[in-house]
């Protein structure tokens, strides 16, 4: 087996085991309004000396409280401080001494008794840590879960024998304590003033769900260790740095992924003018086209992570609709076969080709996943009658198709609590959520269920005719999308030709200038002038030569007698003179020859210069012809942009450098048109119509699948195929399902690896890496969205202890550390992303989103500088609003006080509620029912205390018709509560 995967999972399992069982806050109190004596009571008491506490009059409820709930008592046995065992744990790994011990109050085991003293055996719990501590020293790789389950079952069984059907007594409790020490580690506290045995007082209402006290994730990690799938293996191994590709501002990749062929055929039907930002669209196109095992997107709240997920959801819906469009009639989507030959009836199985589009949204934050599932079906997502649009005809077309889906609107409205356009996503996860969904789709007696709606619709329509019409409509729109893409692809070809010809055009233009300059700067005239001067000089020399010849001849005739006499007498003067004339003659001849040579050379130069000019003229003519041809070639592109002014092209202006150009670029997307945007949104709605008709056309098969889902726990062992098919049916009814990681295993238990086709993890930066293992093991593809610089995962174990585990299993720090999250691991497994930070402290993040649509200055500028390297972009419309004075406010209120209980500072709460009262008064004076304000707190205790205080203060101030309690719970919460708002 892969050593890194095995060691990492082992380290994560051990870390999960190290979570202790914690006592409730020992300083907290129960409200006096609960009790008959009208006195507040401490929530936790010392219980070292046993007595029948259920008979204590202090804990007797008044009549109103009794009608709504009951008192129960939770016993915490063998209590200790976590720091006491932390040193022991670290000694196992040969780690150093603890200097700041963890002072959390922990217990060995716990159980509850009712208000009559009877033990509620189902509440018996032993933290797995107590089993691990008993055996860990001898074997760090021991399968603790198997050992724990075996010992816990034996412990519980013997506890039942000891208790029987009797009330708890001192003797029975002593026997339970002795039995506990046989199977689990026993620690007694050495701290003074701390309860060795404690009891908690709890007011329990019927709807309260007991929490699973052991880690939710260990079983799935043990399951994954046996046969990890490719997605989980990639998640743990990541990608080598040398293989990572920076996509931010990468011209090659951005232009590639924004070609029409990379755009999904379908998109979420938002307003046509509301296009995605540059990196949003790059992310959508890359994820849907490449179908990689792991993709990740990074951006703070407000950058459109959920928005891009909607487009990905729409893509998968359209792709499944294409498989439906291959059917002649909807009933062909199912096949009937017996699981066993002895079965009385066959099971209706959804054909395999239609099952490859199961989508799950998961998070560690329940509010996040519920928000997504409840937002998607909202009527405003598709039908926007009160919102103005640049394209009212497109909006009307969307609404007309959406009307065909209102058969499911009533059920969707019951599920999300407000007006809905149709059935699309389901809030699953906790049993209560699933039961609520199943009530609406199958079992409700108070309203018409989905099951009944489908059967009635099947009996009242000609389903095959409707199918034929809907299929034709879908295929027509799909063809239109392909035509528009082809049209834009032709534009891309024209643009490529234009860009290429533009480069050549510039080269030709430069060459023309150079050729013309060379022609202008030729030296023919100077050569001709020099030739003329030479010819004049030659003529002059010829004249001199002729004159000299004539003079010599004349002199020769006159002086012939004298010369002979002088010669006779021995005189030489005449001979000397003749020699001088001959010398002059020779010099003139040489000069003439030189002049003639120069003239010949100049003639040659003139000929060459003329030839060069003629050649340049011919080249100029050819270039001018080429330029004319290039202009013709460019006309195709010029015609395209004239006919498609709404299509953004990656021209020189688009890729211009500078901050202003960068901001402009980040807001735009390439190679799409308003019409293509519209048709893609329309295709999604028509795909949903096909899904609707598949449900109606297979009403009985859907009913069968829903009943199988209702009874899925009965079939886990006897007929697992039924359970798998039932989940396929559920994913057909609800294309998108949401759940928390904590509920994933209980939901999809026994489902094989790779069962989920697409897993989307929202706010992945808030989740510890091991939380997602069970989900990833069951997923073929993972898309993680989040922001590592926002809220980090909540880790309750000391950093040094985590480091000890990491070193013991020899795994990289990126996998096991206090800073690791699902987001950081997903980013590390994504080949596309961005190196963030300075040299030496660089961090690899996934595809970055830079356009922030939910922030105003000055907060935008502050955050951008602190956390985002000033890469974030404020949209143009927000900047325009700033010019009109629409900006945010930032201020601080300095309040001093002490925290009690826990993190709540009463003095701060008073000031906050006073400010809140002012907001309410202002809102009511302006005619509004309630103010538009959020109070965000760092801790849950602060939230609950402020809600309690505000409820009391607002009661006399606000009209009784207004549900103040509901408003407070929606408007006051922790940072997690308001993620995405």
Where are these regions (language model features)?
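Conserved helicase/translocase motor-coupling segment
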Residues: 864-954
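Pre-P-loop entry segment of helicase/translocase ATPase cores
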Residues: 162-286, 322, 326, 408, ...
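Conserved helicase motor
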Residues: 741-746, 940, 971-978
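A helicase ATPase "motif cassette" and its flanking acidic/Ser/Thr-rich regulatory loops
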Residues: 1-204, 636, 644-668, 672-686
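ASCE P-loop NTPase helicase motor core
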Residues: 273-442, 583, 622-625, 629-632, ...
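Conserved RecA-like P-loop NTPase helicase motor core
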Residues: 792, 966-981
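Long, amphipathic, heptad-repeat alpha-helical coiled-coil stalk/linker regions
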Residues: 398-404, 408, 412, 416, ...
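Conserved helicase NTPase catalytic core signature
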Residues: 217-275, 590-593, 597-755
